[in-house]
Amino acid sequence: MSQNEIKSYELEKHTTKDIHDSHINGSLIPIWRDWDKIITVQPEMVYVTTINPGEIKGPHLHIIRHSYYVCIKGRVVFIIKDESGKYIEIESSEEKPVLIEIPKNRSSAHINLSNEPSIILALVNPSWKPDNRDEHDVTYD
């Protein structure tokens, strides 16, 4: 597969259990494992970003940054413009986690569909730097 393709991967979600009485005490979601071979561009930075309820981040374009995103709290729709100009909508949430790969030179907007702040885990290459943000604002029709 090309590093220029927009891709998404449904992630596994496993319940975790208490050691004393086996009640469910949480969950575990593998984002990446070495044998999955879904991360084709090695991340140089991992960070957490938030989106307030009903808010939109973007749309903006990263010219040099290749990004992977997964919503780990709340519910977010990612709207990505592909190379033909078509809009692709991919939803990721804490209930149904989806890892979304957005190559450089593809614009995207991230919309919080939740009533509370949503939290997104981001894996990017190259690293974000305050003096070289690589965020170029664009507009969607």
Regions found by a protein language model. Give the residues of each.
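Non-catalytic, conserved peripheral segments adjacent to functional cores
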Residues: 1-99, 115-141
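Asparagine-centered strand-capping/turn motif at beta-strand->loop junctions
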Residues: 110-113
